[in-house]
Structure formats: C-alpha cells, structure tokens
C-alpha cells in the first residue's frame, strides 16, 4: 500500500480522508451492488471481503479522470506501462485499485465508507 500511496502524492492528489477497513461479505455486496447480476459478482465480493482495504478520498483538479488514468485499464495485462494496475495488479480480478467512474458514483462510494464525514 505504501508504494501506491507514494504515487498518489507524487501524482498531485491530496488525501482528504482515509480508512483501513475489512469489509464483510454484506458490505462488499452493498458496495458493488451495481454488478449483482454479473457473473463475477460472487468472486468479486469474496475477494473484497477477504483482506483489509485502504479506502481513500482523493482530491485533485479533474480527480476522477486523473485517477482513472493513473489506475490504468481494469486488466493489468492491458494497462499502460507506468499505471498502478500494470505495476501492482495481478489479474483482472485482483487489479490493485478501484476508482469511481463519475461524480454520481463517487458520491455513493464516498458516502458508503465515509458516512457523516463532511467532504466537499
């Protein structure tokens, strides 16, 4: 995690909030509910509830696009050299990072993990 956090700072993101969590299966199912009908849902929620995760709220100009560019393609084998997923991902299922894809998604995801915390 330290190497990813170092890249976060190097790339100009500010960490507005951070939590180390260990999601229950139910937490993972709630967080990834948009994928409930997908064939990978069970494996995804099993994996996400298997070990602790570091959840971050990042801030930067055009943060969503900037973060998604830094993460790289979902499949580490197809991710650009220098991206987090290329460097730290092991497979499409274990790709090291997650990122919101739109402001509405970010609002849900931040609310899911940082309930009651005022974030702009």
Labelled PLM ranges:
Residues 1-120:
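Non-catalytic terminal and connector segments of soluble metabolic enzymes
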